[in-house]
Every structure is written in C-alpha cells, then in structure tokens.
Amino acid sequence: MNRLQLFSKGLRLIHKMSEEALAGVPLVHISPEGIFKYVLINVIDGGDASKAVVRGFDDCTWHADIFDREEEVFKKLGLRAECPGGGRIEHNPEKKYLKVYGYSQGFGKADHAQTKRILATKYPDYTIETSDEGY
C-alpha cells in the first residue's frame, strides 16, 4: 500500500468515526422541569453531515453557557457546533406541556418550529406550543 492509499484509508476511517459520533448525539437534552433558556445547535461531523439538536438547562444563566458546555462535549467527539439561535422553554411534565418562546440576546431567535419538531421526537405525547412573544 502506498502513502496515498494509506492516507485515503485513514481519512475514510476518521470520517466513519465522526459519522458514528454524530449519530450518537441525542436530539434533545433539557432540564426535567421549569422555565429555562435553551439553544438550538447544529452539530457537524468532519464531512457534510450535520443535525440540529436542542439543549436547555436550568443551571445556566446565559444562552452562551449552554452552548459552551455542549460545544466542549461535541469537540471531545470530534464534532463541531454552531448556534443559530436560542430562546426559552417552559417544561411542565405533570401536564405533559412544553412551551418554546423568546430569543437569545447573544445568538438571536432560534427557529421555534424546528425546535418544536425536535422536542416532539423525545416528547411525542406532550402538547408543545411555540410563541414569538416574550423574552
């Protein structure tokens, strides 16, 4: 095997590993209840593959705190992350209710309709509302 073949084989292996890492990233990771900030994150592997995920934590004061925390997780998996926007989530598990609204001062407003679709994959039996009102 020549150097070019070895290099190509190595690249294919790295690409396969990053695709597997991307496939293993959960679509949703949010606090179990309460009102908290969230961010929509585009997670990107070493190639062209990507997926949008929702992250929201009640222990983070700023949207950037959420993104920074998750970006570190993705970097360890060999993935990149971009944040197109954020907002807030109201999560009431007793009522099986989620409300997605508001915006991030730092990242702008996330696509709440996209966020709703992603949340529905984890919470299919919930009522999920969106609103462009509020902060």
Curated annotation (Swiss-Prot):
MF terms in GO: protein histidine phosphatase activity
GO CC terms of this entry: cytosol
InterPro entries listed in its UniProt record: Janus, Janus_sf
Highest taxon of source: Eukaryota
Residues binding substrate, per UniProt: K37, S104, Q105, G106
Active site: H63 (proton acceptor)
Gene3D superfamilies, sorted: Janus/Ocnus (3.50.20.20)
Gene Ontology biological process terms from the UniProt entry: cell differentiation; sex differentiation
Entry annotated with the keyword DNA-binding: no
A Pfam family: Ocnus
Keywords: Differentiation, Sexual differentiation
Keyword Glycoprotein listed: no
Role of this protein: JanA and janB regulate somatic sex differentiation.
PANTHER family: BCDNA.GH02250-RELATED, JANUS-A/JANUS-B
Similarity comment text for this entry: Belongs to the janus family.
Listed name of the protein: Sex-regulated protein janus-A
Native source species: Drosophila teissieri
Gene: janA
